[in-house]
């Protein structure tokens, strides 16, 4: 994402980790306009469908709220079918002249599946249960993969909340568009 346009808001890290029968989606609170931090406590994680679905967004805030509303409508139309609702949203996003201009990505999770939805119409399920988006996404993803591997090999009692918090903290230490004001939401299946 090009952060040189001083008229657009950028910067976030959203991370989702699914381990065992639990999934956590976390996001930082920083909103950046050009080279200025506009807000440090934005809430980019939201629950939908009677708290059975967690979503997190990266990109333009107004665009993300438009997508939240659309996704909520799809979930009402297809209750309990997260994959179908997300595919329907992605189709609309790709085909609708207005929606195609939206600049956002989403991570969406329920008790059984985690998905990444892009503006290009992609709906992707991460292979290893770990997904990350946003300017610090790759940093959080690398940290999460390393910590999950360490958990598997050496520390099976390492809590999922610790892995998520530490991965987000590492991203915040490196990415100037990410801060340590982390919001986490969890679903246990």
Swiss-Prot record:
Principal EC category: hydrolase
Residues making up the signal peptide according to the UniProt record: none
Active-site residues, record numbering mapped to chain: 12
Enzyme Commission identifier(s): 3.4.25.2
Regulation affecting activity: Allosterically activated by HslU binding.
Gene Ontology CC annotations of this record: HslUV protease complex; proteasome core complex
Reactions accelerated catalytically: ATP-dependent cleavage of peptide bonds with broad specificity
Top-rank taxon: Bacteria
Record CDD domains: protease_HslV (cd01913)
PROSITE patterns: PROTEASOME_BETA_2
Main localization, broad class: cytoplasm
InterPro entries recorded: ATP-dep_Prtase_HsIV_su (IPR022281), Ntn_hydrolases_N (IPR029055), Proteasome_sua/b (IPR001353), Proteasome_suB-type (IPR023333)
UniProt function note: Protease subunit of a proteasome-like degradation complex believed to be a general protein degrading machinery.
PANTHER family from the UniProt entry: ATP-DEPENDENT PROTEASE SUBUNIT HSLV (PTHR32194:SF7), METALLOPROTEASE TLDD (PTHR32194)
Subunit-structure text: A double ring-shaped homohexamer of HslV is capped on each side by a ring-shaped HslU homohexamer. The assembly of the HslU/HslV complex is dependent on binding of ATP.
Name the record gives this protein: ATP-dependent protease subunit HslV
Organism: Anaplasma phagocytophilum (strain HZ)
